[in-house]
Design a protein with these regions (language model features):
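Ser/Thr- (and often Asn-) enriched beta-sheet segments in non-cytosolic proteins
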Residues: 41, 52, 67-69, 79, ...
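Beta-strand elements of well-folded, non-transmembrane domains
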Residues: 55-57, 74, 116, 135
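Extended low-complexity, serine/threonine- and proline-enriched intrinsically disordered segments
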Residues: 64-92, 131
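Bacterial Sec-dependent N-terminal signal peptides
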Residues: 1-25
Length: 165
């Protein structure tokens, strides 16, 4: 009974941590490949805002100077320049019968600079996004907005932190 309480407590703590996280993301599988998991967040350094994008995949990495191209549902176009701020990998193995199958996951993070005026455009909703990566670009088209309005809300929260200091 005590172990059930501990497990339940840990589950609630983990759920609470995930609820406080200021990220928005999606999983994308193109052409039956392994796909990737994308996460986006908003950060502020001094007076500059940026969108921080992280990809977790079996092979995709950001280029050294990546670009993020965004088309909104109203047809407006944004092109953001960025820099890579981190690359990493994790390896594990899956046991199938008496064979160990190696599994490697690559994580790459890039930071894209954005102005408050561009955040206003993002609030219209993101219809399409393209990120320059290697070995191939990541491109996703949305039928409904999944990231635009949320990124705008994250921007508003970052802006309020300065105003309420």
């Amino acid at each position: 009974m005590k172990t059930i309480k501990i497990i339940l407590l840990l589950f609630c703590i983990i759920l609470g941590i995930n609820a406080k996280a200021q990220t928005v993301g999606y999983t994308y599988k193109a052409l039956a490949a392994e796909g990737c998991n994308m996460k986006y967040s908003v950060a502020k350094q001094d007076t500059m805002y940026s969108i921080v994008a992280t990809v977790r995949s079996d092979r995709m990495n950001f280029l050294s100077e990546p670009t993020m191209k965004i088309r909104t549902f109203s047809g407006k176009y944004l092109e953001l320049k960025g820099t890579v701020i981190g690359n990493g990998s994790q390896s594990a193995g899956i046991i199938s019968g008496n064979v160990v199958i190696p599994v490697t996951e690559i994580s790459s993070t890039a930071q894209f600079w954005i102005t408050p005026q561009q955040f206003e455009i993002l609030n219209e909703g993101v219809a399409k996004i393209r990120l320059s990566m290697t070995p191939m670009n990541h491109e996703r088209t949305f039928k409904k907005d999944k990231i635009g309005k949320k990124l705008y809300r994250f921007y508003q929260k970052e802006k309020q932190k300065d105003e309420n200091f």
